[in-house]
Amino acid sequence: MPKLKTKSSVKKRFKITATGKVLAGPGKKRHNLSARSQKAKRQNRGSQVLTHADGLTVKQWAPYGLN
C-alpha cells in the first residue's frame, strides 16, 4: 500500500503538541487591522488549541504527524 500524503495546507497552519493537542494560529491578522481595536489585536496573538473534533480532522490530514 502506498504512503499517505500530508496536506500541505495543514503543514503550514497547524502544530501537534507532544500530548496530541492541535495548535493553530488565529486568523484576521493580515489586513484591515486599522478597523480592529488594539485590545482585539493584542488578544489575537499566540496560538489557540483546537476543539477535539477539529483536532481529529486535522490529524486525519496529517497521517504521520507534523514535524
Swiss-Prot record:
Gene3D superfamilies xref list: 4.10.410.60
Species name: Granulibacter bethesdensis (strain ATCC BAA-1260 / CGDNIH1)
Gene Ontology MF annotations: structural constituent of ribosome
InterPro entries tied to this protein: Ribosomal_bL35 (IPR001706), Ribosomal_bL35-like (IPR021137), Ribosomal_bL35_CS (IPR018265), Ribosomal_bL35_sf (IPR037229)
Official protein name in the record: Large ribosomal subunit protein bL35
Keyword Ribonucleoprotein: yes
Pfam families in the cross-refs: Ribosomal_L35p (PF01632)
One BP term from GO: translation
Gene that this sequence comes from: rpmI
Composition-biased stretches (Basic residues): 27-44
Region ranges (Disordered): 22-52
Signal peptide interval: none
Lineage summary: Bacteria, Pseudomonadati, Pseudomonadota, Alphaproteobacteria, Acetobacterales
Cellular-component GO terms for this entry: ribonucleoprotein complex; ribosome
Superkingdom of origin: Bacteria
Keywords: Ribonucleoprotein, Ribosomal protein
Record-stated family: Belongs to the bacterial ribosomal protein bL35 family.
